[in-house]
């Protein structure tokens, strides 16, 4: 039985939640998000809270209710406050700059990499070695950050590469002769 599903999601002021059949739409100051709800979960919107109840007899219904509750909570937080992910470039000559809606990355390859940002994600480069991604969809922000990090993940010997701002890179000692 999911403990997560038992906690209702409160709807803050300025956020509008509508349920049409199995489609949940959340609109707020930062934008709007839509998600199709699993058939094993019943969603009830009343008195400024969203409750999630499993369908009787459905296999894994409590687990789906907990997952749905977490996803909807991320939608509500995203449209009201937004999400942000910071990346740091560590290495000699590693640079990032914004070119329109693209990020131009110099990561030690023989050519610069151009990463196109999807709709719903905005980027900012406060310095040449920092990237800040912002948006309303938490999953999309994490996906874009993982794609950029995937170009040059941090290596354990010198720590060079693209890393999340809060990431601790485990360092290894060089081989001794």
Swiss-Prot record:
One Pfam family linked to the record: Ribosomal_L6
Region annotated Disordered, chain positions: 152-177
Segments passing through the bilayer: none
Listed GO biological process terms: cytoplasmic translation
Mitochondrion is among the record's keywords: no
GO function terms (MF aspect): rRNA binding; structural constituent of ribosome
Keywords annotated in UniProt: Ribonucleoprotein, Ribosomal protein, RNA-binding, rRNA-binding
Compositionally biased tracts (Basic and acidic residues): 152-171
PROSITE patterns: RIBOSOMAL_L6_1
Gene Ontology cellular-component annotations: cytosolic large ribosomal subunit
Function as written in the Swiss-Prot or TrEMBL entry: This protein binds to the 23S rRNA, and is important in its secondary structure. It is located near the subunit interface in the base of the L7/L12 stalk, and near the tRNA binding site of the peptidyltransferase center.
Subunit structure: Part of the 50S ribosomal subunit.
PANTHER family in the cross-refs: 60S/50S RIBOSOMAL PROTEIN L6/L9, LARGE RIBOSOMAL SUBUNIT PROTEIN UL6M
Family, as annotated: Belongs to the universal ribosomal protein uL6 family.
NCBIfam families, alphabetized: L6_bact
Name of the protein this chain belongs to: Large ribosomal subunit protein uL6
Gene, per the UniProt record: rplF
